[in-house]
Amino acid sequence: MCERCDMREASTIEKRRRFLTASAAMAAMTFGGAGAFSGVAYADAVTKAKRDKLTPDDVLSLMKKGNTRFKNGRRADHNYLAQQRATASGQYPLAVLLSCIDSRAPAETIMDLRIGDIFNCRVAGNVENPDILGSMEFACKLAGAKVVLVMGHTACGAIKGAIDNAELGNLTGLLAKIKPAVAGTTHTGDRTSNNYSFVDAVARKNVDMTITSIRKASPVLAGMESSGAIKIAGAMYGLQTGVVDFFDV
């Protein structure tokens, strides 16, 4: 082989080596923290062993990091078919979320989560009821979830409806559960749904009151929280910003 050919081959090998090194570094940047542990290679599903080693604070940290990836446009390259196959024989979710039905606030997407990472309870205004409490108890006591997260969002239609005393079939009773948050919100200025800062203040108050209701209505969850097995936390999602604001976490 000629000397020039040898040089070309060596150059090609070196370029390929640099490309593979750079690709590995980018993968580490993209997937670091995306799996069950920060710094561990991305996996298609969380395992029981990895989930059980996490603390509630670890789980909340993973959610916060996932939202940071989402809002920065650096979401993990999810292979949903692989995730579906990996979770088909069992599930080991990290958390159970209670969030609003708003189509713009899908928890798995805005926190860059995988199939099988969370249980997701959704109802207008993210209010609890006996069925949801039972679902949360199943998620934590029987399935091993480490966090109960109640997540409201800005510009919430259910909150506006409660403020405006809207009435419509079964929705009337649901909105009645939000009205204590309306009454309990201290806010100067216009206390109508036209005032978005008031709407968002009520939404935040509603999250706080829902957390209090969960602790009072579920001795199972309250006991698990007292023992440190789980954490019950709140958050607000900003529709305009893409940021999930975790309360005191």
Regions found by a protein language model. Give the residues of each.
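GST superfamily/GST-like fold recognition
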Residues: 226-246
